[in-house]
């Protein structure tokens, strides 16, 4: 087995709080067909994101990433913080 290092790339991301009035949401997450909410107004609110691999679920505190080719997907906070740093 070989080892690999992730290439340094710059992505856009934000931490999703699940708050209905979150002002940090970038315009790209609100493009029709990218994402939709379930259980709005409840503690169980989730953000469903249409990805190349199918619909993925983001929960409160997850990071939402837009990759280098415009793909959007959720990432758990521990993985995000171990993989990315501010630029």
What label would you give each PLM region?
Residues 1-52:
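N-terminal domain-onset segments
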Residues 53-87:
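Short, compact, well-ordered microdomains
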């Amino acid at each position: 087995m070989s080892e690999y290092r992730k290439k340094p790339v710059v992505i856009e991301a934000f931490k999703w709080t699940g708050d209905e009035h979150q002002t940090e949401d970038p315009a790209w997450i609100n493009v029709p067909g990218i994402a939709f909410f379930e259980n709005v107004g409840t503690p169980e609110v989730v953000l469903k994101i249409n990805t190349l691999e199918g619909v993925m679920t983001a929960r409160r505190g997850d990071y939402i990433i837009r990759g280098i080719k415009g793909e959007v997907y959720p990432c758990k906070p521990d993985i995000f913080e171990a993989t990315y740093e501010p630029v």
